Each structure stands twice: as structure tokens, then as C-alpha cells.
Amino acid sequence: MCIRDRSGLTFDGNGELWNVEDGPHGGDELNLIKKGANYGWIDVTQGQHYNNEPAKGVKNVPGMTNPVLTYLPNSLNPGNPAFYDGAAFPAWKGDLLLPSFTKGLLRYDTQGGKPGGDPEYLLGDLKQRLRSVNVGPKGELYVLTDETDGALLKVTPGS
């Protein structure tokens, strides 16, 4: 399977499995997991070593499965994501919600079955490392932080 550092797994509304991978400096990935696919680590990476030298891997290799999204140039330090399937935020139906240590909560519009485009940044003003997001029974979001004063946050429209 060749995955570097799985940060989170989630299923989308079609039952497909997605993996968020914490890459080396830069190069965090979102992968759609398919049986028998090779995601390339350590031979393929978009990131670089922490001393800013290029990583061993190359960008693309025939036969390897490329990520759906790659986060460059800096790392997001992604957490456990969720695809939104609630009612509280109807415009987000099917969108990917991705918590991050460094960028808050990212919302990716899902078009053609895959998240893409530029994310909307949410909760960045909290200055907290976001670890996980889950969708509650009424569509509210529950976001877990992991600082020493960590908390479980409930996010509803207007909050």
C-alpha cells in the first residue's frame, strides 16, 4: 500500500474509503483508497526533508496512484477528516471537512465525486491544533483540539 503516515480515514457518501496522509515537510496527501493500489511512499513524494533538501522520492512514477490532493509547500499536519452528510449546513452536503494543526478546519467542495479546488478556511481564528472532526446527528460539527487546554467544540450555523 505504501502510505507514509496515515493521519485519518473516512468514508464518503458512496462508501469509498479516503486516507489523509501526513507527508514530510510539505507533501501531505488526500488519497482515495482502492484495492491493490500503490500510493508510492517512499519512492514517490511531493514533500521534502525537514532540512529542506529534496526527499528521495520523485513526483510521479508509472503504476503508482497519485493523490487526489497534495498540500504544498508547507505541511497542514492533517487530522481525521469527515465528509459532510448533515442538514445544518445544506450547502456543504458531500464536502470534505479536514482538520489541521496549522490551518484550522478546511472545507473542500466535492465536484465529480472528488474534493478539489481551493479550500474554505474555517475556525482558523481559534489558534488551536485541530485533531478530528465528526458530523453529529443534527448536522452539527464536533471538532476535537489537542492542546494542553484541548476541547471538544460544537459548531452550529451562526456559532
Report the location of each language-model feature.
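Beta-propeller domain segments
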Residues: R4-E120, Q128, K138, G150-A151, ...
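Flexible gly/pro/ser-rich segments immediately N-terminal to CXXCH heme-c attachment motifs
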Residues: G124
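Repeated scaffold domains used in trafficking and secretory/extracellular systems
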Residues: L130-S132
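Short, exposed beta-strand-loop hairpins at the edges of beta-sheets
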Residues: L141-D146
